[in-house]
UniProtKB/Swiss-Prot annotation:
Belongs to the TRAFAC class translation factor GTPase superfamily. Classic translation factor GTPase family. PrfC subfamily. PROSITE patterns: G_TR_1, G_TR_2. GO terms for biological process: regulation of translational termination. It is found in: Cytoplasm. The keyword Zinc does not apply. This is Peptide chain release factor 3. One of its GO terms (molecular function) is GTP binding.
Length: 523
């Protein structure tokens, strides 16, 4: 198979949603249909030990939340599928935003009872800005929810994207009968008495009149709604979908696996193949460029706690990876050999000999890489566009509870900060270690991982600081430090100030008008 044919097979996408909409459950079902797992673990089965495959970290298994982005791969219907299961909790949006830089499409999961929720809205805006095609799966049809027409209206009114349903629910909750699949010309029956899951349309494009469904009032209502939508609603356009202007909408129940395989088949038919990426000087690097290139969008420590390893996740942008190849690390200008490279099923992994544009590979990292690094070969020398970061709003001092375990404490700090789990600052005057986060849960996960993975208990003390701003090295003067601010450096040794509030920052600006205070967004 040629390089072009291999690349055209790739479908790389992320699943986004508000917490508890069913994102992890639908991920499990997709993996099951892809033959990657035998049985879908359900988030509700936490006490049974039947944990979700994509939630591999201990704290994720216990709490039923995703706090890291898992990468999973399988083959289905002639396609090589790469799923990135992103964190749903808002405290981990930085990791999610970086992950969205590595995909070609997004699947947006919505709870039929709740509609568009806050985190879904935030994530959609990122997807929209990047022009990523969005496919919508409205979940939990086996429970009572809102009217399907209202949910479609919300997509347009709240998210500002046109929608086109690919199927339509027949009833809902205890009255859920199935899905009217006008895309494939059939009805998918929820709990068929005769064991036949699909009822194919006849030559007139209708359910045969002899079938009991035709006398079902819920089916009659669904038929009327569907005909109205087909006549007056948006028409399906593959070009508009790929351009991110139209979202195909699928209904189903991830928990009961109903409608999921039909969704997968249709999604793979219309989802785009790998696309080009821009370098810092606006050059578009196409997937078929023969030179290998890729960027690191995530670093994860301790995927195998037995070996205390660290993996850098690389999205291949162009060309082909071959085991043992030398690549250029653009940030340092040095050559590195990619000899120990893996692909993933959550925490499970296998060595990979080659991979192509669109694939996600894991490179073992001994401290060489940073999130946002670009790897290239041949004539490609430029970095890709920087990945987004968030400015923390919560800060804590941290120290080792046992001073005799300072070495493991420092190793844990270094690795968790490098993977982007939390931000690190060191006081310019006292040397105190301070952490910054966008939400309280980040601190809790940090403390838990330090104890579990590095055997280092920590003492964490809340700080009064609320704002961080960077300054230029040439503006640095230790005399600017006062009771209203803290002078510090970040992990890249850049100088900064932590302020208690807006008033303290305005006071600083008035006293030092020539010092520029900067927000930092890129790695």
């Amino acid at each position: 198979m040629t390089l072009q044919e291999e690349i055209k097979k790739r479908r790389t996408f992320a699943i986004i949603s508000h917490p508890d909409a069913g994102k992890t459950t639908i991920t499990e079902q997709l993996l099951k249909f892809g033959g990657a797992i035998r049985e879908a673990g359900t988030v509700k089965a936490r006490k049974t030990g039947n944990f979700a495959k994509s939630d591999w970290m201990d704290i994720e298994k216990e709490r039923g939340i995703s706090v890291t982005s898992s990468v999973m791969q399988f083959d289905y219907a002639g396609k090589r599928v790469n799923i990135l299961d992103t964190p749903g909790h808002e405290d981990f949006s930085e990791d999610t935003y970086r992950t969205l830089m590595a995909v070609d499409a997004a699947v947006m999961v919505i709870d039929s009872a709740k509609g568009i929720e806050a985190q879904t809205k935030k994530l959609f805006q990122v997807v929209k800005r990047r022009g990523i095609p969005v496919f919508t799966f409205i979940n939990k049809l086996d429970r009572d929810g809102r009217e399907p027409l209202d949910l479609l209206s919300e997509l347009e009114e709240i998210l500002g994207i046109a929608s086109v349903p690919m199927n339509w629910p027949i009833g809902m909750g205890k009255n859920f009968q199935g899905l009217y699949d006008f895309t494939h010309g059939r009805v998918e029956v929820y709990q068929p008495e005769d064991g036949k899951r699909f009822v194919e349309f006849d030559e007139n494009g209708e359910v045969p009149t002899s079938h009991p469904l035709t006398k079902n009032p819920f089916f009659t209502q669904a038929l009327e709604d569907a005909e109205l939508l087909l006549d007056a609603g948006n028409q399906f356009s593959e070009d508009e979908v790929v351009a991110g202007q139209l979202t195909p909408v699928f209904f189903g129940s991830a928990l009961t696996s109903f409608g999921v395989e039909t969704f997968l088949e249709t999604f793979l038919e219309y989802a785009p193949e790998p696309h080009s990426h821009k370098t810092v000087d606006e050059e578009e690097i196409e997937p078929l460029n023969p030179d290998f290139s890729g960027f690191i969008f995530k670093i994860q420590a301790n995927m195998d706690p037995r070996h205390r390893d660290r993996i850098a996740f690389v999205r291949i942008v162009s060309g082909e990876f071959e085991r043992g190849m030398d690549v250029n690390l653009v940030r340092t200008g040095k050559k590195v050999k990619l000899s120990n490279v893996t692909q993933f099923m959550a925490e499970s992994r296998e060595n990979v000999e080659n991979a192509v544009a669109g694939d996600i590979i894991g490179v073992y990292d001994t401290g060489t890489y940073q999130v946002g690094d670009t790897l290239t070969t041949g004539k490609l020398k430029k970095s890709f566009e920087p990945l987004p970061t968030f400015t923390p709003e919560l800060f804590m001092r941290v120290q080792a509870k046992n001073v005799m375990k300072q070495k493991s404490f420092q190793k844990g700090i270094d690795q968790l900060v490098q993977e982007g789990a939390i931000q690190l600052y060191k006081s310019y005057t006292t040397g105190d270690i301070m952490l910054g986060a966008v939400g309280q849960l980040q601190f809790e996960v940090f403390k838990d991982r330090m104890e579990r993975e590095y055997n280092s208990e920590t003492i964490m003390t809340p700080m009064g600081s609320k704002i961080v701003r960077w300054i230029k090295e040439e503006d640095l003067d230790e005399k600017m430090s006062s009771s209203r601010n803290i002078l510090a450096r970040d992990r890249f040794d850049h100088p900064l100030f932590l302020f208690e509030n807006e008033f303290a920052m305005r006071w600083f600006k008035d006293k030092y008008p020539d010092v520029e205070l900067m927000e930092q967004f890129s790695v």
